[in-house]
């Protein structure tokens, strides 16, 4: 059972029991560790070293939250001073502000705002992530955790122990690489890198052609496609994926692939059929030195028109078709429904401003024509138009 602590300045502090920690891969609290509370943060000391930090909801009126992290923070002067980690650093008073600067190590568990995450800070990998629907309170957490524990098998515990003790691994990637990713606790999905923006940005031809729709993407960007396929194992015949539909191409930072969160399981050369699912963005230029144009980016196809032509249509929802957002995680909302229905309708119900959505077919036709392309043609057909 969870230990429920007394109130302190409107805070109800909950501490997991060691028996419960094993289900989350968390380090047990040793019997000789001493507890110190600073506002809504609970610290556990092993002598003068802080070994664990648990953060609770700040006030009783807030939604229930729980974040448990392992740390290794040395203190001095009767635990009132945090010692620096480097020679250049300066000692700091141990207070709430100081605790926000602690660097987590190893396993951590987060339950906050309906999100659940079990992860390893050292390897930068996530073992499990989900979003729980319902009113955010401790009862909802208890229901989730009871189900989690009851469904945990010995094999699950072994996998969690392996995950806990992994070292950080990096993997090289290239266009065409097929990767696997976890869906829920025991299923896998599959994706493919169709444009390695990181590498292409280094090419003179890429810069010469501007490619603003790709160049403006933040960070170490990749364009990937996610297949309509789910499996209880990542060990599949990747040739099967060639026969699968996919979600529309999306931009994602490379972190989860680079740090092996999404293991690469093979390579299938990128074809123009893959590029039919390519990323599509239309926008007026945001480049101060090239502000008199608007552009369309369709995969590696880049086209421009005078801004004056684009402005004639700005009242027609066109500004919403700029599609240059990017994050660390794949956008797989609706993937299960899309896979079952063999359709991307559910995806487009969520991503309503995507120009590739069927409901925007008329706008897509007009926009493609304005930029010298043809929305009725596939990617290969539009490549041929560009050569004329």
Regions inferred by a protein language model and the residue ranges of each:
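Short N-terminal edge-element motif at the start of the domain
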Residues: 136-227
């Amino acid at each position: 059972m969870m230990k429920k602590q007394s109130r302190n300045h409107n805070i109800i502090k909950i501490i997991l029991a060691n028996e419960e920690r094993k289900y989350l891969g968390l380090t047990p609290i040793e019997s000789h560790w001493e507890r110190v509370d600073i506002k809504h943060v609970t610290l556990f000391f092993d002598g003068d070293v802080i070994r664990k930090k648990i953060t609770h909801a700040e006030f009783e009126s807030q939604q229930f939250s729980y974040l448990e992290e392992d740390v290794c923070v040395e203190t001095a002067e009767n635990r009132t001073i945090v010692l620096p980690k480097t020679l250049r650093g300066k000692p700091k008073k141990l207070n709430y502000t100081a605790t926000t600067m602690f660097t987590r190590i190893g396993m951590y568990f987060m339950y906050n705002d309906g999100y659940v995450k079990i992860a390893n800070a050292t390897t930068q990998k996530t073992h499990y992530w989900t979003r729980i629907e319902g009113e955010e309170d401790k009862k909802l957490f208890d229901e989730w955790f009871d189900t989690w524990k009851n469904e945990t098998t010995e094999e699950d515990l072994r996998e969690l122990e392996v995950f806990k003790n992994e070292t950080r691994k990096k993997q090289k990637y290239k266009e065409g690489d097929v990767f696997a990713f976890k869906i829920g606790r025991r299923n896998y999905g599959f994706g493919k890198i169709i444009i390695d923006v990181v590498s292409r940005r280094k090419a003179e031809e890429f810069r010469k052609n501007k490619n603003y729709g790709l160049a403006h993407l933040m960070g170490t960007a990749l364009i990937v496609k996610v297949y309509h396929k789910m499996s209880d194992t990542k060990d599949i015949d990747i040739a099967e994926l060639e026969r699968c539909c996919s979600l529309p191409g999306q931009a994602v930072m490379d972190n989860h692939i680079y740090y092996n969160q999404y293991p690469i399981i093979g390579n299938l050369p990128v074809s123009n059929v893959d590029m039919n699912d390519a990323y599509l963005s239309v926008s007026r230029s945001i480049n101060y030195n090239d502000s008199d144009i608007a552009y369309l980016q369709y995969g590696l196809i880049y086209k421009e028109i005078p801004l004056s032509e684009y402005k004639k249509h700005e009242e027609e929802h066109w500004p919403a078709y700029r599609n240059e957002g990017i994050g660390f995680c794949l956008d797989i909302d609706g993937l299960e429904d899309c896979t079952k229905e063999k359709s991307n309708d559910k995806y487009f119900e969520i991503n309503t401003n995507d120009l590739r959505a069927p409901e925007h077919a008329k706008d897509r036709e007009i926009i493609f024509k304005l930029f010298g392309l043809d929305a009725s043609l596939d990617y290969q057909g539009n490549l041929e138009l560009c050569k004329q």
